[in-house]
Amino acid sequence: MPDIKTAEVDIKIIESRGETDMKDRQISKAVIKRLPRYRRYLKELEKKGVEKISSKDLSVLIGYTASQIRQDLNNFGGFGQQGYGYSVTNLHEQIGSILGLDKTYKMVIVGYGRLGQAMASYISNNEPNFHIVGIFDVKQIIQDVQFKDAQIMTCGSLRDFVEKENVDIAVITVPSAKAQLVADTVVDAGIKGIWNLTAVDLDLPENIAVENVHMSDSLHALVYYMGDTDTE
């Protein structure tokens, strides 16, 4: 089996798709968070021309047990055939559909410093299901500045823009002190999902899906694991 290496961040998580059958099953967040990883590896297999794979071989690639993989997928109906395994293309498509990636989403980025610029570039180049329709910054922006098809504007027009354009997702990369105000603004305007890349947790209504990406948390955990390795 080929060795697959990738640096793609597991970011494609849409927790509030409005699918009542999935909610009724009360599928754990841990399962949902593993699905993008499955999909990412399946995409690499598909690129290499692999047509089918067993849960055992998939476990070697991903690092989860074969039993865990089967259990996770069985939450959604299985998809495998005994004696055959999984169709790589079909499983990749089905997991994408479960995550909501059979649809497209309008997105705004709020905060256009270095992190906001990096995320705009990453999303536009790697995430075809997410269309950046507007970019906002707390500082005064020179008029008529654009990033590809998205105009770069000041936060004063954020609420009206989100409401008018029926934006689905807001990516927040503003300074931490302004994060809650920005979140409240976009929620009031109808946003249903927030990708929070600031250093603070947001206080939001329960019907708003939020994914907090605190980079320092990951870095600090890395340092712990480095020390743990040294003691072995």
Indicate residue ranges for each PLM-predicted region:
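NAD(P)-binding Rossmann-fold cofactor-contacting core
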Residues: 126-148
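Phosphate-bearing ligand-interacting subdomains
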Residues: 38-46, 149-232
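Intrinsically disordered, Lys/Arg-rich N-terminal extensions and targeting peptides
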Residues: 1-16
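HTH-adjacent hinge/linker in prokaryotic transcriptional regulators
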Residues: 52, 56, 61-104
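Extreme N-terminal segment that seeds HTH/winged-HTH DNA-binding domains in transcriptional regulators
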Residues: 12-51
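Glycine-rich Rossmann-fold phosphate-binding loop(s) that bind the pyrophosphate
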Residues: 112
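Hydrophobic/small residue at the entry helix of a nucleotide-binding pocket
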Residues: 115
